[in-house]
A protein has these predicted regions:
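Short acidic, Gly/Ser-rich segments with clustered Asp/Glu that frequently serve as metal-coordination loops
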Residues: 14-18
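A short alpha/beta connector and helix-capping loop motif
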Residues: 20-48
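Short, solvent-exposed loop/turn segments at secondary-structure boundaries
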Residues: 19-23, 58-62
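A generic "binding-loop/recognition-motif" signal
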Residues: 11, 52, 114
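Active-site-adjacent betaalpha module
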Residues: 1-5, 31-42, 59-183
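Short beta-strand segments at enzyme active-site cores
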Residues: 8, 44-51, 135
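Alpha-helical bundle segments that constitute or directly flank the non-heme di-iron/ferroxidase center
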Residues: 6, 13
Length: 183
């Protein structure tokens, strides 16, 4: 896992808008900050994915403040920023090509929303053959209604998304497990 690309997905101010509702993992940003500090100290690659929506009403629309990165996850000079317009960081972005050209074969993924952009990106990474680790406590989501109209909590949605991914597309780990593995 040493030297894996830390891929941070959609950590923008828009995710804090009250329209989203109640989220899980309130300390996700702290875990992401710990990972970022380690990656930067070790000079390992940190890549940022930014969602740029073309929808006029979206909080992720470029050119307005909600589209900015959250301060605790803002890119430093020289850290690549991958702009995407879909929920998958590989679609239409050149991400796969850039990773392969750089000789990167392993990813550590954190960000939002677990069951949306994180899940679709991790599935694609696994399908493309990247050795992928998903940081469970470095992601979060929101409650939603299932197809039957039953309310599902953010914790339930998050857990199911992780279950969908673990073992087939990635290895789900905690930030502490990941950081301990590097000691």
């Amino acid at each position: 896992m040493r030297g894996s690309v830390l891929l941070l997905i959609d950590l923008q101010k828009a995710i804090d808008h009250p329209d989203w509702g109640v989220r899980n993992n309130p300390s996700a940003e702290n875990e992401i900050s710990r990972l970022l500090a380690r990656w930067r100290t070790e000079n390992w690659p940190v890549w940022h994915v930014r969602h740029d929506s073309s929808e006029p009403a979206s909080h992720y629309r470029p050119g307005q403040p909600w589209n900015d990165f959250k301060p605790e996850a803002a890119p430093l000079h020289g850290e690549p920023v991958i702009a995407k317009r879909t929920n998958n960081a590989f679609i239409g972005t050149g991400l796969e090509q850039r990773l392969r050209e750089g000789g990167h074969t392993s990813l550590v993924v954190a960000g939002v929303i677990t069951n949306n952009s994180v899940e679709t990106t991790v599935r694609m990474a696994g399908n493309l053959g990247f050795n992928t680790y998903l940081v469970a406590d470095g992601c979060f989501t929101f409650g939603r209604l299932d197809w039957n109209g039953q309310a599902r909590s953010a914790d339930e949605v998050h857990a199911m998304s992780l279950a969908n991914l673990h073992g087939e597309y990635c290895t789900v780990v905690s930030a502490a497990e990941l950081l301990e593995a590097f000691l």
